[in-house]
Amino acid sequence: MNLKEQIEEYLQKNKFEIVSRTCDLVKIPSINVEDHSGKPYGIECAKAIDFCDQLCKEKYLVTKNYDYRCLEVMCRENQTGKRLIIATHADVVPTVDDNIYDPFAGKVYGDYIVGRGVVDDKGPLIASLYALAFFKEYGIPLKNDIRLVFGSNEECGMDDLQYYLERAGQPDWGLAVDDDFPTVNGEKGLVHFSISAPKAEHVESVNSYGSKQRLVHDYCESTINGENMVIGRTEKVINPVLHRFTGEERLFKNDQDEKYIREILADIDGHCLGINHFDEMSGKTSVKVFKAESDAQNITLTFDIRTPVTLDIDDVVEKLIAYGKKTGLEVKIVKVSKGYYQKPENEIVSMLTELYNKEFNANEKPYVMGACTYARLFDNGCGFGGGNPHEVKPFPKGHGAAHGADEAHNIYVLFDAIKMLILGIKAIDDKWS
């Protein structure tokens, strides 16, 4: 049999097991929490790592647990050659209120596995595991150092993979399997900054609430003139914090502060901050508020900025600080994460893209996205799958997607991801040999 015939045989032989194991992993509610387990991200994230560890050992793969932050997986010990890391994660975001199905039941409905994290990123994790296990099962030698890494804190800062890379070192190339095929050749930069100003006398408190895994908070509660109000996320109110602070009522003590802050809230491209920018590869700067806090004197708003790949993120930080000095607002930089960009002509990016297009008779192009994945932590890397960019899921509006209600992964898209990862691993290994 040739390679593709072996892949088809492998998928046919293991299809029920692949679905069953994916369902089993989905049943673990691996949401990052602080508990008394002694594990860095809580007992459930640790259980997910243990599950993956056991499954890998059943497949005769070699594993190393990096203190329950990451699990490293290889075909054999003492691998040599260039190093490829394929990174996925077992942690998930918290559930939402409007699920139709139990988010941690891990059940199949029609052609879909439904449950929290099955798209982001447990399905892709299982796909990468079975892709590497294919080489072990069929005795196909890999000449280079091919590793999987399963993380536990991708959704809350990615310090898990940082911890791993500090100890294991950077690979020659890294792949993040955390979006759609064919290839993600860049991610926008990220800056979080806060603005504080004295609150108006009639404002007792304004605070927003949400999980640390979800960017924009789900609720904004305020007490003004003794009257309590809670604004929640609805179809019409996408951002409760923005809705609260763009109403008719003045919330800040000084008229000038109110004016400046309303300008920022209304300026989604960052013009008033001096950071508006556009490039053909990644689009334009985006700015949005996502959190509100208050104390006895001040209101603090925290904003998320996504920057095009050609905009120097250090310049963005400098301009934010300069804006604070110019306006008298208290500006603090909360978080900075540099994006990345690989030219579409990069030999691995182009090879993987062509591989996908050939396999599916498509004409897809590499793309840049605003979301953050493990790919940005590699000195050299990109995203590679594992979703279908044209899939239309048979669920109600707002259901079926990553981070949403009733997250759902098509079983055949999952099998396609395994096939593409096998082909991708083999192509990179051959190229490096």
Question: Language model features by range: what are they?
Answer:
Residues A90-V92, I146-M158, V177-P182, N388:
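Acidic, glycine-rich active-site loops and adjacent beta-strand->loop/helix elements
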Residues K57, V62, G81-F150, K397-G400, ...:
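Active-site metal-coordination/substrate-binding segment of hydrolases
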Residues E155, L161-D314:
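Midchain, well-structured core segments that form catalytic/ion-binding scaffolds
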Residues L125-F135, Y164, I224, F378, ...:
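Buried hydrophobic packing segments
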Residues Y10, D295, T353-N357, A362-K431:
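Zn-dependent metallopeptidase/amidohydrolase metal-coordination segment
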Residues Y10-E17, R21-I28, F51-K59, F134, ...:
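Generic non-transmembrane alpha-helical segments
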Residues E249-R250, K288-E293, T302-V309, E330-V349, ...:
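A short beta-alpha structural unit
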Residues N2-I113, L142:
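Acidic/His- and Gly-rich active-site-bordering loop/insert found
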